[in-house]
Amino acid sequence: MSLKELMAGLLLCLTFNTLLAEVRIYEGKVMDNSGKPLEFANVALQSLEDSTLIDGSVTDAEGKFAVRGSVVPVFLRISAMGFEDRIIDNPTSDSGDIMLSPASYMLGEVIVKGSRPMAKLKGGGVQVAVSGTYLANTGTALEVLGKIPFVAKSGSSIEVLGKGTPIIYINGRQVRDMSELDQLASTDIKSVDVITNPGARYASTVNSVIKISTVAHAGEGLSFNDRTTVGYKHYAYLFEQVNFNWRRNGFDIFGMLNYENYRERPRFSNTTFQYLKSGIVQQNSSGLEAAKYPVYQGKIGLNYNVSSHNLGFYYDFSFKSSSSIGRSLTNRYIDRVFSETLENFYDINRHNRQQLFSAYYTGEVGKLRLSANFDALWQINDRHTTENEITTMNPERDFTTCNDVKNRLFAGNLIASLPVWKGDFRFGTEISNIHRTDVYSGNAEFIRRNDIKISETTTALFAEAEQTFGLVSASVGLRWEHTDSKYRQSGQLSEDQSRRYHNLAPSVMLSSPIGNVNARLAYVRKTSRLAFEQLSSAVKYIDRYSYESGNPDLKPIYRDYFSASATWKDLVIEMEYSSTKNYFMWQTSEYPGSDDATLLTMVNMPRFNSFGAYINWSPTFFDCWHPVLMAGVQAQDFEISHADKIMKLNLPLGTFRFDNAINLPWGVWVNIDFSARTSGNCDNLYLKPYWQCNMGLYKSFDKDSWSVKLQLNDVFGTWRQDMVSYDALSSIFSKKIYDTRDLSITVRYNFNSARSRYKGRGAGNTDKSRL
């Protein structure tokens, strides 16, 4: 059956379901006797005739719930540990505030056993429960994400299969540094949402979103937690982090200090073939580098929650100074005849300083829900390089280069939502302003100086409606974006390179149960604009025969995604088709004025199509073994011109993962995880296969006040980055080797555990990523 036929069949089933029953949504807010919201209260919608369970839910952090059922005589049963049950006969659509009274007695020791599917369709993606499951004993948020359906983890990198690198949020706040995922303990995570079809509320450049929600700890006064990680990966390393929070009567002061000292020694070997007018040039290169990455980071902020209003701000600063020294050796051949040997020694020093001020407000005025965010970001990044170049054909030369970049971002958004008819209507606006300076210079005549200034303002408006018709839920959204970019070279405005973009990004989603299967169809349109470095016309020196430059004439990428998803018990399936226009990639051309040097720059490619299918199965056996089996395949009809011939790059790429979490006696958890990737094509790359095995032991003590995690990644040292890239004039066979066998031990201590109630989402989040 073709993908189009499957989508048509699912859509037909969804249409029939609208005729089956008239369904009403029952909403409300559960509070304790002091008026505070109750999280995790159980809400059951039952028939008045025979008490048959129709639907059930659990209240969120604000005490809110929503259940749905046919319009027949029903009643609501609300229960929570430590409180008397509350029964509401014949409830209306909005039950308002529901107050529970404290129980006059407490139960003795009770053991309740049950099971529920860990993953379910929600919104434009899949939601996975973490709290109360084996995933809570994984260690860190980064390790949890590596076990989530349709998510692939490689080192500290996270990718959503078929969608690339996601935007990640923790409690609505964007994660800008992946080390934040190592800082968050898995025991503090409530749930993870993987949104593969982000709607109009997200920027049109966002292809996927991961939202992490944390457990809301009760209690007031001072709380803090400390995390210490020591490990060995050829070099010893240390991570140290302290979080604190002081809470009283809805008022929070929170902060964080983080220090990291990390080193690595990447090695590489490349074989490059270039098809130039002077002949076929072959370069065999190898190199070794030693790098240090110390990190100093801190944060302080405050938060105030009163009734249905929340506001707060924080200030975050970081200083990252890295240094690396290395050597590369290249043997050069022309038409298979040895030409010369090129040897480079380099010393690179980088300094990255960042300051971020972020503020937010959320509240309710009647039925209108409001959310406002403001962010101000300053970055100073500099890179200083000293090189010594020795060749057998030319004189030795020493030179230095310097690249100084400064970024400033102001961004704000305002989002409003209110119940309309049988659902919600959400609308809002977002504005961001960026100013960037990029100065590149060197002390040699063959290095061009560039002084570039870019100022860019983006304005966005969006509207999104969600409605329920019978058993069918529908969502329709539209986002409009306008970007005005001014490009200046050496103080002079360049009209050709200054841009104005107008973009419309629609989204449509339908979901409904079909028997025991929950199904969803979705369409979204997304765009991608280049990072500012890729728009720079500055020509940067790589080696005697290689230069690199951005391309200010590039057009944005446009992608149309069509997807079908379904869940059944412990099984989750997703199929996807996408069409990509103006995809950009690196291309090699002959350097102007030279017969043997090349220039690497980005160009737009013709439209191509991609296909993907993914399946995730997460059962439980014997109440102690929790395996997860995930498999996926991606295919494309991509083709390029290579060495004056058309090359088709359409070999499917397979991804597999087999995770195992085993609960041993004495509360010890063992994790044994396998992952693998087949060979195949991805864009203009041919990726070679690899496999990897990770193992871990986890144990908590004193009611989770202490925890210890022993982890060994890449047990057999099999992970490699091995690939071949193709463009018009070159093919590059590259292999990068890292010290991926990594032994570490992490000790955490929690005192009076309480997480900040900060609920800001941030603004200009995709622009922060571009910076």
Regions found by a protein language model. Give the residues of each.
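Short, acidic, small-residue-rich periplasmic hinge/interaction motif at the N-terminus
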Residues: 44-46, 79-83, 95-134, 153-155, ...
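Short acidic/polar hinge/loop motifs at secondary-structure boundaries
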Residues: 68, 147-149, 173-199, 242
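N-terminal periplasmic accessory domains that precede
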Residues: 93-99, 109, 141-144, 178-179, ...
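Face-selective signature of the C-terminal outer-membrane beta-barrel domain
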Residues: 297-322, 345-490, 513-518, 571-575, ...
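Outer membrane beta-barrel strand-and-loop segments of large Gram-negative receptors
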Residues: 409-413, 460, 555, 572-630, ...
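Outer-membrane beta-barrel signature, preferentially recognizing the C-terminal barrel domain
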Residues: 453-456, 496-499, 527-581, 598-611, ...
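Surface-exposed extracellular loop regions of Gram-negative outer-membrane beta-barrel proteins
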Residues: 482-489, 512-561, 576-595, 715-726
